[in-house]
From Swiss-Prot:
GO MF, one annotated term: tRNA dimethylallyltransferase activity
Residues at the site labelled Interaction with substrate tRNA: 104, 126
Reactions catalysed: adenosine(37) in tRNA + dimethylallyl diphosphate = N(6)-dimethylallyladenosine(37) in tRNA + diphosphate
Uppermost EC category: transferase
Record gene name: miaA
NCBIfam families according to UniProt: miaA
Domain of life: Bacteria
Identification of the protein by name: tRNA dimethylallyltransferase
Ligand binding (ATP): 13-20
Family, as annotated: Belongs to the IPP transferase family.
Length: 313
């Protein structure tokens, strides 16, 4: 590892594991600036259901890449990488260490490994695709994508014309599918990265925390928050923002699917599944140091020792 490279810290972990609390403590003790690595916290007006840091927490530890988009907008992994690299560069220029905190593992992976260079947008091809969609409908365009790139078609909904159009455009420009191109790694992250994951030792503790968080969300006005989104004319259930756990289940409730208690139960179950996927991903992560959610002092000491060791080299 080249010690001339600037340092960066990754603080990963499943939902409800205590990442924000630990990050705030780190901000108090070290010259770090926080960057959110969370595909839900990017959205404005989605505060309660995403467990977004509150005003007091943000005063103690400002987070970059929070509240940058309207829920009607999409945000790609490539856009996150571009924005995060820009923020990291700015933090390093201030003589500080970027602390990236969140649970969107795909974002971390893209940062570490880079992304394959995709062809630039072509206005003529994009216009051609949009013209076809006007004639045939986006469902038919999605069927086209299924034929050429079933993996991308599985991820991209017919009601997401921005991403659907881009996937078709990439194929028509390059002759290669989005799936093929994204399997090619790009430029690696030019930083010395200290990678940590925080989680309780017992799975039951994660489940308890998730249930407690959901209960607090409901008491804090989560139903009203989702209702205000539901009443907008420009949002629908297939947008990435509304597919976030908790929001999807409440949206279904407003659509007449089951009772409020059903929605809460489904939301808790979906959040548990998310945490399980995050932990599974982290268990296969290389060069990762695990921290115990129930021992914050020990976690702080572990990170401090790592930083002190690097500074002494």
């Amino acid at each position: 590892m080249n010690k001339a490279l600037p340092q960066a810290i990754f603080l990963m972990g499943p939902t409800a594991s205590g990442k924000t609390d630990l990050a705030i403590q780190l901000r108090k003790r070290f010259p770090v600036e926080l960057i959110s690595v969370d595909s839900a916290l990017i959205y404005k007006g989605m505060d309660i259901g995403t467990a977004k840091p509150n005003e007091t927490e943000l005063l103690q530890a400002p987070h970059r890449l929070i509240d940058i988009l309207d829920p009607a907008e999409s945000y790609s992994v490539a856009e996150f990488r571009r924005d995060a690299l820009k923020e990291m560069e700015d933090i390093v220029a201030q003589g500080k260490i970027p602390l990236l905190v969140g649970g969107t593992m795909l974002y971390y992976k893209a940062l570490l490994e880079g992304l394959s260079p995709l062809p630039a947008a072509d206005a003529d091809i994009r216009a051609q695709i949009e013209q076809e969609a006007e004639t045939l409908g986006w469902e038919a365009m999605h069927d086209q994508l299924k034929e050429i790139d079933p993996v991308s078609a599985e991820r991209i909904h017919p009601n997401d014309p921005q991403r659907l159009s881009r996937a078709l455009e990439v194929f028509r420009i390059s002759g290669k599918t989005l799936t093929e191109l994204t399997q090619v790694k790009g430029d690696a992250l030019p930083y010395q990265v200290h990678q940590f994951a925080i989680a309780p030792k017992e799975r039951a503790e994660i489940h308890r925390r998730i249930e407690l968080r959901f209960d607090n969300m409901m008491k804090g006005g989560f139903e009203e928050e989702v209702r205000s989104l539901y009443e907008r004319d420009d949002l629908h259930a297939d947008l990435p923002s509304i597919r976030c756990v908790g929001y999807r289940q409440m949206w279904e409730y407003f659509d007449g699917e089951g009772t409020l208690d059903d929605a809460i139960f489904r939301g808790i179950c979906a959040t548990r599944q998310l945490a399980k996927r995050q932990i599974t991903w982290l268990r296969s992560w290389k060069d990762l140091t695990w921290l115990d959610s129930d021992n914050i002092d020990g976690a702080l000491q572990t990170i401090s020792d790592r930083l002190d060791k690097k500074q002494a080299q």
